[in-house]
Curated annotation (Swiss-Prot):
Name of the coding gene: RAN1
Keywords annotated in UniProt: GTP-binding, Nucleotide-binding, Nucleus, Protein transport, Transport
Annotated GTP binding sites: 21-28, 71, 125-128, 153-155
NCBIfam families, alphabetized: small_GTP
Residue numbers spanned by region Switch-II: 71-87
Protein name as annotated: GTP-binding nuclear protein Ran-1
Gene Ontology annotations of biological process type: defense response to bacterium; defense response to fungus; protein import into nucleus
Keyword DNA repair appears in the UniProt entry: no
Family membership noted in the UniProt record: Belongs to the small GTPase superfamily. Ran family.
Length: 221
């Protein structure tokens, strides 16, 4: 159910649901946006925190009401009330934990069962960590389902804005939309090796040109 205070702003606002296994960094990611963290509200009936994240675009201000599960996914699936009226979504996994990627199809299925035809971004978090278990070339689910994929590092703010910009463009139907101002973000807690990450991004591009494997299970053999 949409929050009573959700449509009080006089500029476009959207419900953004963030899903993925516990411990993948969803809460850390949302809390990087300082204004949203300051203005968050708890919705006890569903057990979620809702963070209002504002972004400034060349077409004006927009707001994402980011629904964060507050860790309840660790105790079973999420209730439909979490997904209902969702207008866009982020599915997050942890590149240092293989199982969190293997569970992405389940999250995608649960999401699409309630929210049909909404823009979805897949995010591989924690790319700042050295012992990566899910290599860039092994991430293929987004290609099978026509999702956008970004490698991110919540703790270093790496690529923080990209999922939001992609979703904003999709929701506005305007590929030329861009952010004109950086939101206030928490200072980086870690630093990412940009040279290393550029190699990963290059690997992603190369993988995109290859035929898809028949089954995701094959990629971890």
């Amino acid at each position: 159910m949409a929050l009573p205070n959700q449509q009080t702003v006089d500029y476009p606002s959207f419900k953004l649901v963030i899903v993925g296994d516990g411990g993948t960094g969803k809460t850390t990611f949302v809390k990087r946006h300082l204004t949203g963290e300051f203005e968050k509200k708890y919705e006890p009936t569903i057990g979620v925190e809702v963070h209002p994240l504002d972004f400034f675009t060349n077409c004006g201000k927009i707001r994402f009401y980011c629904w964060d599960t507050a860790g309840q996914e660790k105790f079973g699936g999420l209730r439909d009330g979490y997904y209902i009226h969702g207008q866009c979504a982020i599915i997050m996994f942890d590149v240092t934990a293989r199982l969190t990627y293997k569970n992405v199809p389940t999250w995608h299925r649960d999401l699409c069962r309630v929210c049909e035809n909404i823009p979805i971004v897949l995010c591989g978090n924690k790319v700042d960590v050295k012992n990566r278990q899910v290599k860039a070339k092994q991430v293929t689910f987004h290609r099978k389902k026509n999702l956008q994929y970004y490698e991110i590092s919540a703790k270093s703010n790496y690529n923080f804005e990209k999922p939001f910009l992609y979703l904003a463009r999709k929701l506005a139907g305007d590929q030329n939309l861009h952010f004109v101002e950086t939101p206030a973000l928490a200072p980086p807690e870690v630093h990412i090796d940009i040279a290393d990450q550029q190699k990963n991004e290059a690997e992603l591009l190369q993988a995109a040109a290859q035929p898809l494997p028949d089954d995701d299970d094959d990629i971890f053999e």
